[in-house]
């Protein structure tokens, strides 16, 4: 996307944001931040990266202001919510179509949120009544829908039309240490993604027990993978992530996905994840 096109999209986003927070009665609270965002967009010396960082900070502040202090501290049982995307549904075209993004986000991810909330609520009811007849079912539902919700909540923010297509800094160095080179990592991750059996994910993770990165795959969301790791960069290879556009050609979807990957989220997660280091075995 050219600078002018992204700039126009950001201007529209700022105006829509103003309307939204005005309806919530919070315009006075955030008007200065939005105006500064608009000034940055008009400044020829600022970059798309500057705009992204400022918009992300503004979005975070507004989102957090809409939560209660309890909600910020933890998610009450059965109260998980669908995260909003940091870009338009059409933003990842031509690599991922608008129709796929709408269906994937509003239907499939929402179903995982709903399923997780249902499972948590049923397990809470079981504890209260001491009736554990269906515990096996609800624990499976908890694992499936919970993993689906959490992985998607990373996945959306690991893509962007103007994202960082190659990691740098500490994460790049750890990729080099863990896989030998970035190109070796990319080939490994690509091949793992293409060869997940059935439906599932390929995930770059930090492994605190080994002190390095690993590439894992998971069938569905939760099967045949490892514990004690922290996901950094996931790629969804369920058919609903690509079938409307690529039909049964998962390989083409995976190859094109590298055109929308955004390493900024993975780098941010790694900065926190690398602080978790267990005794090495």
From Swiss-Prot:
<dbReference type="InterPro" id="IPR019832">
    <property type="entry name" value="Mn/Fe_SOD_C"/>
</dbReference>
<feature type="binding site">
    <location>
        <position position="236"/>
    </location>
    <ligand>
        <name>Fe cation</name>
    </ligand>
</feature>
<keyword id="KW-0560">Oxidoreductase</keyword>
<dbReference type="InterPro" id="IPR036324">
    <property type="entry name" value="Mn/Fe_SOD_N_sf"/>
</dbReference>
<keyword id="KW-0479">Metal-binding</keyword>
<comment type="function">
    <text>Destroys superoxide anion radicals which are normally produced within the cells and which are toxic to biological systems.</text>
</comment>
<keyword id="KW-0408">Iron</keyword>
<dbReference type="InterPro" id="IPR019831">
    <property type="entry name" value="Mn/Fe_SOD_N"/>
</dbReference>
<feature type="binding site">
    <location>
        <position position="152"/>
    </location>
    <ligand>
        <name>Fe cation</name>
    </ligand>
</feature>
<comment type="similarity">
    <text>Belongs to the iron/manganese superoxide dismutase family.</text>
</comment>
<dbReference type="InterPro" id="IPR036314">
    <property type="entry name" value="SOD_C_sf"/>
</dbReference>
<dbReference type="GO" id="GO:0004784">
    <property type="term" value="F:superoxide dismutase activity"/>
</dbReference>
<feature type="binding site">
    <location>
        <position position="104"/>
    </location>
    <ligand>
        <name>Fe cation</name>
    </ligand>
</feature>
<dbReference type="InterPro" id="IPR050265">
    <property type="entry name" value="Fe/Mn_Superoxide_Dismutase"/>
</dbReference>
<dbReference type="InterPro" id="IPR019833">
    <property type="entry name" value="Mn/Fe_SOD_BS"/>
</dbReference>
<dbReference type="Pfam" id="PF02777">
    <property type="entry name" value="Sod_Fe_C"/>
</dbReference>
<protein>
    <recommendedName>
        <fullName>Probable superoxide dismutase [Fe]</fullName>
        <ecNumber>1.15.1.1</ecNumber>
    </recommendedName>
</protein>
<feature type="binding site">
    <location>
        <position position="240"/>
    </location>
    <ligand>
        <name>Fe cation</name>
    </ligand>
</feature>
<dbReference type="GO" id="GO:0046872">
    <property type="term" value="F:metal ion binding"/>
</dbReference>
<dbReference type="Pfam" id="PF00081">
    <property type="entry name" value="Sod_Fe_N"/>
</dbReference>
<dbReference type="InterPro" id="IPR001189">
    <property type="entry name" value="Mn/Fe_SOD"/>
</dbReference>
């Amino acid at each position: 996307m050219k600078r002018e096109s992204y700039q126009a999209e950001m201007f529209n986003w700022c105006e829509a944001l103003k309307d939204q927070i005005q309806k919530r009665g919070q315009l006075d609270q955030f008007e200065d931040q939005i105006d500064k965002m608009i000034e940055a967009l008009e400044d020829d010396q600022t970059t798309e990266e500057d705009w992204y960082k400022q918009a992300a900070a503004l979005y975070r502040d507004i989102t957090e202001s809409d939560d209660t202090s309890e909600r910020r501290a933890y998610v009450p049982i059965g109260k998980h919510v669908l995260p909003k995307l940091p870009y338009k549904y059409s933003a990842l075209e031509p690599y991922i179509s608008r129709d796929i993004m709408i269906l994937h986000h509003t239907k499939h991810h929402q179903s995982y949120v709903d399923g997780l909330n249902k499972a948590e609520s049923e397990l809470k009811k079981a504890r209260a009544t001491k009736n554990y007849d269906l515990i096996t079912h609800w624990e499976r539902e908890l694992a499936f829908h919970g993993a689906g919700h959490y992985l998607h909540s990373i996945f959306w923010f690991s893509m962007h039309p103007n994202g960082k297509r190659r990691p740098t800094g500490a994460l790049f160095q750890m990729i080099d240490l863990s896989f030998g080179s970035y190109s070796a990592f990319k080939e490994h991750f690509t091949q793992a993604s293409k060869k997940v059996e059935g439906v599932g994910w390929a995930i770059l993770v930090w492994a605190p027990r080994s002190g390095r990165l690993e590439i894992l795959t998971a069938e569905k969301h939760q099967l045949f993978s490892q514990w004690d790791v922290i996901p950094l960069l996931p790629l969804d290879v369920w058919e609903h992530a690509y079938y409307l556009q690529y039909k049964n050609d998962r390989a083409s979807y995976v190859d094109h996905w590298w055109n929308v990957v955004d390493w900024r989220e993975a780098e941010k997660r790694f900065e926190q994840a690398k602080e978790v280091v267990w005794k090495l075995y």
